Amino acid sequence: MSTLTSTQAGTVAVIGAGPVGLAAAAHLLERGLTPVVLESGDGPGAAIGQWGHIRLFSPWRYDIDAAARRLLEPAGWTAPDPDRLPTGAELIDDYLAPLARALGEHVRYGTRVTGVARFELDKTTTVDRDGRPYLLRTVDDEGRRQDVVADAVIDASGVWGRSNPLGAHGLPAAGEEAGAPWLAGPLPDVLGKDRARFSGKRTLVVGAGHSAANTLLLLAELAETEPDTTVTWAIRGRDASKVYGGGAADALPARGTIGTRLKALVESGAVELVTGFTIDAFSADADGSVAVEAKTEGRAVELEVDQIAAATGFRPDLDLLREIRLDLDAVVEAPAKIAPLIDPNFHSCGTVPAHGEADLAHPDEGFYIAGVKSYGRAPTFLLATGYEQVRSIAAALAGDREAADRVELDLPETGVCSSERALDATGIIEAEEDAGCCGTAAPAEEPATAPARGLATGVLHGRAGRRIELPQAQSGGCCG
């Protein structure tokens, strides 16, 4: 049996009490709206708490939302050193926890959202749909069901806990059961509480992102002091250059340094790199180890390991949104208007043209996906981008169209990041391929792309491995 909670007019339900969800609440309050933050965990930033030992790439100056700051500072809160890199635990203790306390009764913990719909309508019903409030079905820690009604919804629930499977084809491999004793999460605390699990053991790290890189560095450090600790790194691609990143060209030095250090470990043999790696099955052994049946570059292999760190990336949980009319990209499962700018097949530079409410809107008016979940399966999200998203959304919900459309993203303007899908969408690739040396130039008033903002990785191409060069004006050339 469920109970129905009525809310006052101007109520906006926010799913998730992470950095972007709490920032959304701060902006909504500032706009005179009433946020109701629904968090499944027992405190703010519950997902971040699971990787609290990891240090963020971005310094504090990019990790604090402007409206949250305005809410906190009058109560005596002091911002941390803007140039310091916080750990996940520090992000919670020094920022999210004080912010959640300031929001008070607007945040409800132990409340998991299991479904969202238009009130008294299913997805197929169009008549009287516009203007209907939303119903959010929730379950508490004791299994009690409660329905919450709100005028609008911001889904900032993130993607943690929805890891991509280890198996090939995007599907779980045989024997890949949740809770297997040899299966570690994407960011285990190798030098802390999980040290005994990895000391003197053979660990396989699977993945080609920053989570994998962080875990590999920690395992290599452990191996320096713990005999018989071995580290194998498996990736599906044929080289690891994307993971190594842009080095000194990275706008976030900590991120660039990680790639540089990892490359040195591979070259020294401290980390064994296996490329072209796809997993078919796992077979648990009686001694607690596991046999990994796989292929590398098409050749069948079997690895015997004790632990597997699955840093395979994440995918959004869309099941709870099945009754909402969404406009999502078929490739990355992000809002269709921003998807071409972040598709990891062609884009890995870490920047994106500034975008707001208009780019995040869906056919069901008043429903938004924000934060890292708005990037779907793409991995290049930054907190500051999420803060700008919810600032714009709150302005739109309050009826301030001018503010909603204004760009207030506090990140460097890096110019154009070459994304093949984005270029194709603007006709640049077609023009470049069809025009030839003396072809008709694009009209000057049609810009090739929009300036991007972000913290550039120094890597300009994605999985496709192609560097897309922007057309440039030629002086002279074959046409004189």
Language-model segments: what does each one mean?
Residues 10-36, 212-222:
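N-terminal Rossmann-like FAD-binding beta1-loop-alpha1 element of flavoenzymes
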Residues 43-94, 186-192, 233-253, 365:
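Glycine-rich active-site loop/strand segments that organize a redox cofactor
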Residues 4-5, 88, 155-225, 231, ...:
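Glycine-rich dinucleotide-binding loop and its adjacent helix/turn
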Residues 315, 330-480:
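C-terminal, flexible cofactor-proximal segment of oxidoreductases
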Residues 115, 138, 220-330, 395, ...:
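A Rossmann-like FAD-binding core segment of flavoenzymes
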Residues 78-152, 156-161, 280-290, 304-307:
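Feature captures the FAD/FMN-dependent oxidoreductase FAD-binding
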Residues 11, 34, 202, 227-230, ...:
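Residues at the starts of beta-strands that form the adenosine-phosphate
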Residues 20, 43, 160, 211, ...:
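Conserved Rossmann-like nucleotide-cofactor binding loop
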